[in-house]
Amino acid sequence: MIPKAEQAHWLAAALALLIGLLLVAELIVGQEVFRKRAWRSHLFPAAVIASSVLLWVITIFSTFSTLHLLAHAIWAQAALVAGAVELALVRGKLRSPRWSLVPAFALFVSGVAFLVHEQYAWLYSRSAFLHHAIGWMLVVVALFPLGQALEPRRVVWRAGFALTFVLLAVLLFADRDAAPIFGRFGPSGP
């Protein structure tokens, strides 16, 4: 059974919320305390890689159009590369804070893919509105990991990066395929 698009979006939202809460928890208690147990340091990269695998599964089932297939494949590949780099950083294989440029690039490319794959205008439907909102959000929030690469000690960059995934989850949870844009004020009128 292939889930409906909104159910796949809700699953992605749950995973994005998990990733965001992991990053917020690490931000609150500090990296030293959070990573005292080795397994906790691997949670974020593992969740990102798991999201990549799920995106590849969705790519297989997104037979709506070639554009949807390519967009999901780009998101899956961006998540896989970002997760792999984060895993290498956690394991000590990579050391430079400049590797934070990879998640910045992944967020930017994902945002552009969101914008390109939505063929309808902002106010066509709730789904179109959310795709545009998520796309522009991802393009803008790519500045957080970029700032983290340039100034790794500033907390604002880590906080922004963590809250990016929480906001992404909120937007994805709002997705309903056949819903009007703003509650009862849709194409059917008030």
Predicted regions and their residues:
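Non-cytosolic membrane-interface motifs at loop->transmembrane helix junctions
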Residues: F64-A73, W122-A133
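Juxtamembrane "helix-exit" motif on the non-cytosolic side of transmembrane helices
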Residues: L55-F64, F114-L123, D175-A179
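Membrane-interfacial loop-to-transmembrane alpha-helix junctions, especially the N-terminal start
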Residues: E32-V48, R95-F105, R153-L163
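A generic, lipid-embedded transmembrane alpha helix
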Residues: L43-F61
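Alpha-helical membrane segments in multi-pass integral membrane proteins
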Residues: R98-H117, R126-G147, R158-L171
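Hydrophobic cores of alpha-helical transmembrane segments in multi-pass inner/ER membrane proteins
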Residues: A12-V24, V48, I74-L89, I134-G147
